[in-house]
């Protein structure tokens, strides 16, 4: 197959997560809560630490429920997805 016909490069989830540390992210929980902040750290259990985070219900179009000036820790079992902003 020629290089022009190849699809996008596949990135492993661990590579993706290590590359977005220090960048702004959305973290959606199974409860429907959405957190936006800077990804400070993440571990193998998907436990997440954010700084300068805002908390929303369902989407960022809804009003901010709370803004956190210090760290926010989210338990990995509650995380539905993490996306880079």
From Swiss-Prot:
SUPFAM superfamilies xrefs: Sm-like ribonucleoproteins
Gene3D superfamilies: 2.30.30.100
One CC-aspect GO term: Lsm1-7-Pat1 complex
Highest rank taxon of the organism: Eukaryota
Compartments where located: Cytoplasm; Nucleus
Domain Sm: 12-85
A Pfam cross-reference name: LSM
One GO-annotated biological process of the protein: mRNA splicing, via spliceosome
PANTHER family given in the database record: SMALL NUCLEAR RIBONUCLEOPROTEIN F SNRNP-F (PTHR11021), U6 SNRNA-ASSOCIATED SM-LIKE PROTEIN LSM6 (PTHR11021:SF1)
Function, as annotated: Component of LSm protein complexes, which are involved in RNA processing and may function in a chaperone-like manner, facilitating the efficient association of RNA processing factors with their substrates. Component of the cytoplasmic LSM1-LSM7 complex, which is thought to be involved in mRNA degradation by activating the decapping step in the 5'-to-3' mRNA decay pathway. Component of the nuclear LSM2-LSM8 complex, which is involved in splicing of nuclear mRNAs.
Assembly notes: Component of the heptameric LSM1-LSM7 complex, which consists of LSM1, LSM2, LSM3, LSM4, LSM5, LSM6 and LSM7. Component of the heptameric LSM2-LSM8 complex, which consists of LSM2, LSM3, LSM4, LSM5, LSM6, LSM7 and LSM8. The LSm subunits form a seven-membered ring structure with a doughnut shape.
Protein known as: U6 snRNA-associated Sm-like protein LSm6
Species of provenance: Eremothecium gossypii (strain ATCC 10895 / CBS 109.51 / FGSC 9923 / NRRL Y-1056)
